[in-house]
Amino acid sequence: MKILLGISGSSSVHLGLKLLENLEKKAKVFCIITEGAKLSFEAENKKKLDKICKKRFKKVVFFEDNDLKAAVSSGSFGIKKTIIAPCSISTLAKIHAGISDTLLTRACAVALKEQKKLILGVREMPLSFLSLEQMTKLSSQGVCIAPPIYASYSGVKDLEDLENFIVGKWLNLLKIKHNLFKKWD
């Protein structure tokens, strides 16, 4: 199964990387990382994201966000599920407005027109009325809005447990089995 992971410019890029680490084991993964995500990651970690990705993810196919001719820009390429995690408010707004000026937003437009699974891990707080309205409209079109919110019922003990819960919930939405947190009995 072909899955596209987009990581867009906001804090918590490391959650996208943790998701990528888990996806790489279970599916054919294609990844687009926006310039904003790279800048956020480098500001938070003092490391270059491109170098880390090339070393860590050998099976993942990476595309530049400005490469509008890339295979994932076409519905005929066969991406079955798309997730953006984290998803910036800017990316959310572009998807809502149908603006396809980057590879990531084009790939989301394809997911919408092809009626494929599209999940947005919107990472912002507080949320404006406009962003809430955009999420509501996208949800009414079948888009799954799945912000990175944790729950304490899963036996959370530390930050890694919180991150595992969030990534595990995203994997659940993608119908990918995992052992990142204890399921509710």
Residue ranges and their predicted role:
Residues 1-119, 124-185:
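A cross-family phosphate/adenosyl-ligand binding-site feature
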